[in-house]
Amino acid sequence: MLSDPVNTQKLIQSGNTKKSDLIAVCPTTTAAFLHAAANMDIDIITYHPTETKELLRFTRKHYRQATDRGIFFEIPYSHMLRDSSNRKKIIQISHLYHTVGKSRNVIISSGALTPLELRNPYDVANLGLLLGLSEGEARSALNLSGRSVALHAVTRKTGKCVSFIAETDKLDPEEQWKAKEITDAEERLAGEPEPKKMKMETA
């Protein structure tokens, strides 16, 4: 939890932090959020509705500062299952990410405290529609974003670039979905809007 940006440098430079593969912070104030987005050498900015007492306020510029530095925004869906107040706050911050940053670099995680709070990937992808994500953005937030944040953590620790190259037409049939995911991600990065699709359940 990060409420005061003053002492963040000591936190980031501590021995325990340097040993960590992934570094995530949870800003509980707007000042802490803006500092993390612009200055902190981290991988993830997460959100905790019960610890964050104020509505976080930031602009497209602040969001872009974070994403340009490879930082991802985590949405832990399990908070939505606990009570209506938490559900409202998670939806609110998710739609703010979409309004300000077009949901770029969003990663959906469980944040579960018990096995009962876990949901299968298909349910979580459908939940992404409620969070303001398109169908493709929801899929990306579940798989490609996780891989990207792991690669960012490697480059942050080593100072080196990591890349994987593969010819998509030579992928095995069970891996062909990766080619479509990459194409969808490239279109989103290029700024091409993807129409939202709502899956309707029939009784």
Features from the language model and the residues they span:
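Charged catalytic cores and adjacent phosphate/nucleic-acid-binding surfaces used
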Residues: S14-K18, A31-A203
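A metal-dependent hydrolase metal-coordination microenvironment
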Residues: M1-F33
